[in-house]
Structure formats: structure tokens, C-alpha cells
């Protein structure tokens, strides 16, 4: 999968990310990856479910879900563990 078919989830409203995913599929992407970490994980799940069940129903399916942990440095020099998720949506043939 090409790196340009990735939507990174942040603090914006969910519908902004839904529109970004739908735009990727409308431009011909076979797969779109939704990535998030920390508190944005629930928003990433919401985006995937809204795209799959409301906008592109019977057109898009979940290919795989990857979860993990990243070690991020803090301001005082220590490291903290942050959860990550990647949801890969694929267009049905």
C-alpha cells in the first residue's frame, strides 16, 4: 500500500477524517489506512465504522487491524508508553 493512502487521526471532528477517507477511495485507492495513537484511538474506530456502515456500505470492508505501543520521550527526559492502532480499509471487488 502506498504511503499517501494514510489518514492520521488527531483532534479535529470525526467527519473531517471520514471525508478524507472517502476522498481517498473516490480517487481510486484500493486500500486506505487509518492511524491513531493515544486518546485518538476511539476517534479512529468511529471513523472506520462511519465510513463502513453509513457512507460506503457494501463497498468497503476492514482488511486488518494492528495494535501496538510506542515509547515516546517526555519533556523531563523519561519515556512513556502510548498505544497505537492502524485500521486498514479495503474496497470490495
UniProtKB/Swiss-Prot annotation:
GO molecular function, one term: RNA binding
Keyword DNA-binding appears in the UniProt entry: yes
Chief place of localization: cytoplasm
Domain of life: Archaea
Modification after translation (UniProt): Acetylated. Acetylation at Lys-11 decreases DNA-binding affinity.
Residue positions where N6-acetyllysine is found in the record: 11
GO biological process: chromosome condensation
Subcellular localization: Cytoplasm; Chromosome
Keyword annotations of the record: Acetylation, Chromosome, Cytoplasm, DNA condensation, DNA-binding
Cellular component aspect of the GO annotation: chromosome; cytoplasm
Function as written in the Swiss-Prot or TrEMBL entry: Binds double-stranded DNA tightly but without sequence specificity. Involved in DNA compaction.
UniProt family annotation: Belongs to the histone-like Alba family.
Name of the protein in question: DNA/RNA-binding protein Alba
